[in-house]
């Protein structure tokens, strides 16, 4: 078994524990206590208008959809940084969302029973542009899609 297999086993165990506890998803922390990622998605917070996502040095896997979010944020003029996040940063975030190949872009409404709230304006804006891009409605992101004749 290779190390990436162990990563996914740990993620799935965390997901099972989260669901048993009544949550939809688990947020994984690094050994140093930094927010790393969710079980199959990257995590983002929005604080003071800036999108922040954990770096790979915190244990986050680099994500294809994460890179799409970075590109969309840049195109929209929204500051985007990779930086260490503490669990408490999730509690005080203005907005939070996750992204992944299967999940796409999903707002986070609460963490540890602490309400973040409805999707905020930046999450909604990034989510809408992402959905338009994957539907082929945004020519500037046409390199993300391979069109297949049915």
Give the role of each language-model region.
Residues 1:
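Glycine-rich phosphate/oxyanion-binding loops and their immediately adjacent helices
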Residues 4-150:
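Helix-start/capping segments and mature chain N-termini
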């Amino acid at each position: 078994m290779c190390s990436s297999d162990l990563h996914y086993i740990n993620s799935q165990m965390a997901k099972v524990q989260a669901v048993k506890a009544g949550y939809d998803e688990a947020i994984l922390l690094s050994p140093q206590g930094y927010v790393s990622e969710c079980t199959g998605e990257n995590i983002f917070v929005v604080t003071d208008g800036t999108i922040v996502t954990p770096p790979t040095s915190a244990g986050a896997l680099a994500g294809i959809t994460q890179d799409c979010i970075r590109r969309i944020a840049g195109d929209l003029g929204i500051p985007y940084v990779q930086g260490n996040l503490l669990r408490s940063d999730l509690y005080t975030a203005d907005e939070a969302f996750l992204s992944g190949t299967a999940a796409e872009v999903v707002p986070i409404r609460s963490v540890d029973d602490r309400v973040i709230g409805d999707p905020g304006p930046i999450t909604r804006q990034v989510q809408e542009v992402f959905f338009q891009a994957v539907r082929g409605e945004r020519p500037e992101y046409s390199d993300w899609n391979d069109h297949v004749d049915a």
